[in-house]
């Protein structure tokens, strides 16, 4: 009953704190004095993996479903039909320009306390990845590519001018933009022989 006195934000922040600081005891030293045992060494990675596995059993059942990611953020679980897309691990030879930006955008968009501004930043970051790929002539064919960059350039995501379309439901359309950009990036990388591993 007591857990109901705490907000979701408080509990999730506590989970993130515990994940950052948890370690698994590895080597014990026992003494005769009061029959006590003390750990002499710890493994942080193993501790985090076990903690994440255990806590995710409960987080998945809470509200719409959440998960604790490897980076230590409590994230909203993507819709079932898009979960594989979100969990696809991208590995390219342009880690800073592509891999890290995709990971940062995904974490920012799906984080339990993300705001509309956070979601806009996440969409814009994926747009930066598309722009980077475009500079290397990695683009969708024909009208599809034009449509992607029409969204980026004319829907108040990264430019500020009179032709921007800004009167739309941000919550709904940012979700559409995010998953459209993410799926387009993964498709382009697969088509161009970059390594994309499905977990």
Would you name each region that the model predicts?
Residues 1-15:
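N-terminal leader/presequence regions that precede the main folded/catalytic core
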Residues 3-6, 43, 47, 93, ...:
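Conserved aromatic-histidine-acidic binding/catalytic patches
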Residues 13-102:
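Helix-loop junctions and short alpha-helical segments
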Residues 47-54, 114, 139, 161, ...:
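Alpha-helical structural elements of signaling/regulatory helical domains
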Residues 92-125:
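A mid-sequence, solvent-exposed acidic-amphipathic segment
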Residues 124, 135-199:
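Alpha-helical oligomerization segments
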Residues 126-130:
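HEAT-repeat alpha-solenoid elements in large eukaryotic scaffold proteins
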């Amino acid at each position: 009953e007591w857990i109901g006195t705490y907000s979701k934000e408080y509990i999730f922040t506590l989970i993130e704190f515990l994940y950052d600081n948890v370690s698994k005891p590895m080597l014990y030293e026992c003494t005769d004095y009061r029959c006590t045992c003390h750990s002499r060494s710890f493994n942080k990675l193993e501790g985090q993996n076990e903690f994440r596995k255990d806590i995710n059993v409960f987080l998945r059942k809470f509200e719409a479903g959440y998960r604790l990611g490897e980076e230590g953020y409590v994230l909203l679980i993507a819709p079932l039909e898009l979960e594989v897309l979100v969990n696809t691990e991208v590995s390219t030879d342009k880690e800073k320009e592509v891999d890290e930006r995709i990971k940062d955008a995904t974490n920012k968009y799906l984080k339990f306390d993300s705001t509309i501004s956070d979601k806009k930043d996440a969409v814009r970051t994926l747009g930066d990845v598309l722009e980077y790929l475009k500079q290397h002539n990695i683009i969708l064919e024909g009208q599809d590519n034009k449509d992607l960059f029409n969204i980026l350039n004319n829907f108040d995501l990264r430019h500020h001018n009179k032709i921007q379309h800004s009167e739309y439901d941000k919550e709904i359309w940012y979700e559409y933009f995010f998953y459209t950009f993410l799926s387009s990036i993964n498709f382009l990388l697969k088509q161009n022989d970059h390594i994309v591993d499905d977990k």
